Amino acid sequence: MSHPALTQLRALRYCKEIPALDPQLLDWLLLEDSMTKRFEQQGKTVSVTMIREGFVEQNEIPEELPLLPKESRYWLREILLCADGEPWLAGRTVVPVSTLSGPELALQKLGKTPLGRYLFTSSTLTRDFIEIGRDAGLWGRRSRLRLSGKPLLLTELFLPASPLY
């Protein structure tokens, strides 16, 4: 099962440098904190619509593979993050199987919990980079994050109803 927003997320073209954009737009795109929290600050109830979750092989993550360790399997989670039931963001998380040990096993059991609620409660969370991307007028970003030094890649596409626009 897929969703058109996730197809568009995978088509994002990334900027080599941070583009000169409106400061309010950059504030959203370069946010270091939880996007879930930012959406809740808009006075909205945030929920997750699960699109796909499970183990995949390298051939299913061609866009992410160069940014992650080469492994036999990866945990893939694709969701829509909704505010008061309206989709504001499409998210795709790719986690190498080697990351899924110790406390990070919880990444497989998030269910309808937003990823940000888990990630941003961890004292071991670090971010290697944020890249800004665009496709067909929609903005997105991807970040390589680390929990206890173990990598995962998060890609987010801001949907038309998002307050980013």
From Swiss-Prot:
Stated role: Removes the pyruvyl group from chorismate, with concomitant aromatization of the ring, to provide 4-hydroxybenzoate (4HB) for the ubiquinone pathway.
Alphabetical list of Pfam families matching this protein: Chor_lyase (PF04345)
EC number annotated for this UniProt entry: 4.1.3.40
Further comment found in the protein's record: The sdgG mutation, which suppresses a conditional mutation in dnaG (DNA primase), has been localized to one of the ubiA, ubiC or yjbI genes.
UniProt protein name: Chorismate pyruvate-lyase
SUPFAM superfamilies: Chorismate lyase-like
Family per record: Belongs to the UbiC family.
Keywords for the protein's UniProt record, in alphabetical order: Cytoplasm, Lyase, Ubiquinone biosynthesis
Keyword Lyase on entry: yes
Top EC group: lyase
InterPro entries noted in UniProt: Chorismate--pyruvate_lyase (IPR007440), Chorismate_lyase_/UTRA_dom_sf (IPR028978)
Gene: ubiC
Annotated positions binding substrate: 35, 77, 115, 156
